[in-house]
């Protein structure tokens, strides 16, 4: 059991570290209590990382073309959504976060109200749109981080490409760091 806990902690660290190379917890041996790994902070919350720059580049171009963008972030224990929200709002881009705290039955209404109020970008966990939402208003989907569940990924990537979609194309971007 100890090996599984250590492996799980390593896997979580290795998956999230490229996106948030700061403020990561130490990996502690579950029996001895000794520190196994103390992740080095390679940046901080204020540092704009290369993946964030790429996301901003895509969003700027899409907003300039009059399109709306949905950004998916899978890791809920990080501050990625809050950081992306700040970066986009600093650019004057009207951005909202569709949080998991909004119950599924109210998400469509929540989204409709935000779009009517002029939201250009929505940031959410792909599980929030896994079922029941048509996202035809969004012609660009950016997977900033991806989880392990391919069903969720496929469902989220198809939310904008529905039978009643009138846009000539829907673009899906999956951002990642090379050699990771």
What are these regions (language model features)?
Residues 1, 124-180:
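SF2 helicase/translocase ATPase core recognition
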Residues 2-122, 127-133:
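Conserved Helicase C-terminal RecA-like lobe
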